[in-house]
Swiss-Prot record:
It is found in: Plastid, Chloroplast. The record marks 70, 244 as: Chlorophyll a binding. The keyword Ribonucleoprotein does not apply. Its main location: plastid. The mature protein is composed of 2 almost identical repeat units. Keywords: Chlorophyll, Chloroplast, Chromophore, Light-harvesting polypeptide, Plastid, Repeat. This is Peridinin-chlorophyll a-binding protein 3. Homotrimer. Water-soluble antenna for capture of solar energy in the blue-green range. Peridinin is an asymmetric carotenoid. GO terms for molecular function: chlorophyll binding. Pfam families: PCP. Sequence repeats lie at residues 1-173, 174-323.
């Protein structure tokens, strides 16, 4: 079909560029991760919200297929010094993404092109050192693929149905997981609301250094995350995504980007239920999958040791309820 043909031509044209790129040690990518949200935090938060909203208009089966394609590509990439996937896996990822995008709401997806701060500068940096002919050929194939996706668009027709609670509706937990999630939220919210999510030095430092410091560890961590997601209930994933969208909308109205208490609780409950649907062994492996994760958590809770202890106890109880 049109997407298959166009995505193959796009992959053929772009792989020579992709395989020359050092995905693990790129200063351009590391700099963007470190600087983009810090330079324009509100736009970055809005972009994440738009990204999640667009994801909720996509066909869940095609989203799952794209996740699986990325996971397979990472399996081959981690054995490459530059974290470059095989040409076959690279092509499979591009086709899966094209089909997934074709299922999205066209207007919402189009808005993503300019949603992230300084994304044009990042793209320019990535292509600056490439052969001009190769870059032009890649861009032409990208335009052709864009046209094929546009022609195949179903404009969100297969989007999942999500039951939306009115913002005025109070959060009422139900069942053992719900009650444990409520206690966890009550114990952790006093800590969370004191954090400045716009300018937190601990989070900025982690984002700036984790992937560039140890890319060979970060890539397997992402791969394991994708593998775990493939074992989860899709409806519960959708509910967790929607809970985050709702929380971000409320957080954007506060100086430190802190979500409202009820939205924070809804996010925790949605995540707990989603995690409860995952393969237990695969999820447990995530606890130590990302480099520096334990150090980040210690830094975030160091300012409030007494509250942190109480929060940890409710976390243990929530974990028991979920598992």
């Amino acid at each position: 079909d049109g997407i298959a043909d166009a995505s193959k031509k796009f992959s053929d044209a772009t792989y020579p560029i992709a395989e020359k790129f050092d995905w693990g040690g790129s200063s351009a990518v590391a700099k963007y991760i470190a600087d983009a949200s810090a330079s324009n935090p509100r736009q970055a938060a809005l972009a994440v919200e738009k990204l999640l909203e667009t994801g909720l208009t996509m066909d869940p089966k095609l989203v799952r297929a794209a996740v699986a394609a990325h996971s397979k590509a990472l399996d081959t990439a981690v054995s490459n010094p530059k974290l470059v996937a095989s040409k076959e896996d690279f092509a499979a990822v591009n086709e899966a993404l094209a089909r997934m995008i074709a299922s999205a709401d066209k207007q919402k997806f189009a808005a993503l092109r300019t949603a992230f701060p300084e994304s044009r500068e990042l793209q320019s940096s990535l292509f600056a050192g490439n052969n001009g002919y190769e870059a032009e050929k890649a861009y032409d194939s990208f335009k052709a693929l864009t046209s094929a996706v546009r022609d195949a668009s179903i404009n969100g027709a297969n989007a999942p149905v999500i039951a939306e609670a009115a913002r005025s509706e109070r959060y009422v937990p139900d069942g053992p997981v719900g009650r444990a999630a409520k206690k966890f939220s009550e114990a952790t919210y006093p800590i969370m609301e004191k954090l400045n999510w716009v300018k937190s030095p601990e989070i900025s430092k982690y984002l700036a250094t984790a992937s560039s410091k140890d890319p060979k560890m970060m890539a397997p961590g992402i791969d394991k995350t994708l593998e775990v997601a493939l074992t989860m209930n899709q409806n519960l994933i959708n509910n967790a995504v929607y809970a985050h969208v709702r929380a971000i909308k409320g957080a954007l109205n506060t100086p430190g980007f802190v979500a409202e208490r009820d939205d924070f609780a809804r996010v925790n409950l949605a995540l707990a239920k989603m995690i409860g649907s995952a393969d237990p062994a695969k999820f447990k492996a995530l606890l130590t999958a990302f480099p520096g994760n334990a150090d980040l958590q210690m830094a975030l809770f160091a300012a409030n040791p007494e509250q942190a202890k109480a929060a940890y106890e409710t976390f243990v109880a929530l974990t028991s309820a979920v598992v």
